[in-house]
């Protein structure tokens, strides 16, 4: 039986409160209505679109965890982070991110997402990329969502933090990178200073 508009909107608010990452398409399927109906309901209820909801959750949840750069400077939207351990961000490839003729994402956007996530996962006031080894596995097209997963895997002999980042579209690996990160609070050894030596 089809729900009344009032009941649907009440359930819509409840569903989004429980899962702010749910898409309009998933909501439309759940409530057996069109995507346009969901968008109208959201507008009437002053519920922001998915992208804004993700940013709001990130601001509330991760503002105190990301120290090396402001959240608005991260390329993509952080959806999970454990400082000095792991982080996840999503990046929706739009028209402005692709080559006009081929509709393929420009590589620097995929690199920027991975690099900024590698910086964000470092729990320090200053984190810089000292070295990056990257590999573009397959082309990413307009309309695809890239999920980047960063994991702190260790340290180099010089005390740089190693961060592995793998980016996926669905379950398919599209980009991988190993980033050596300089950080300002490197633990001092026998009177060594923590200044950067390149």
Swiss-Prot record:
Record-linked InterPro entries: DeoR_HTH, HotDog_dom_sf, Transcription_factor_FapR, WH-like_DNA-bd_sf, WH_DNA-bd_sf
The name on file for this protein is Transcription factor FapR
Could you tell me one molecular function GO term of this UniProt entry?
DNA binding
Organism's domain of life? Bacteria
- Phylogenetic classification of the source organism: Bacteria, Bacillati, Bacillota, Bacilli, Bacillales
* Keyword match DNA repair: no
Q: By its UniProt entry, which HAMAP family does this protein fall under?
A: Transcrip_fact_FapR
| Pfam families in the cross-refs | HTH_DeoR
Give the encoding gene's name: fapR
Instruction: Provide this UniProt record's keywords sorted from A to Z.
Output: DNA-binding, Fatty acid biosynthesis, Fatty acid metabolism, Lipid biosynthesis, Lipid metabolism, Repressor, Transcription, Transcription regulation
Q: What family does this chain come from, according to its entry? A: Belongs to the FapR family.
Q: Taking every annotated instance into account, which residue ranges of this chain make up the domain MaoC-like?
A: 102-167
Keyword presence, Ubl conjugation: no
Q: Which GO terms describe its biological process?
A: fatty acid biosynthetic process; negative regulation of DNA-templated transcription; negative regulation of fatty acid biosynthetic process
Record function comment: Transcriptional factor involved in regulation of membrane lipid biosynthesis by repressing genes involved in fatty acid and phospholipid metabolism.
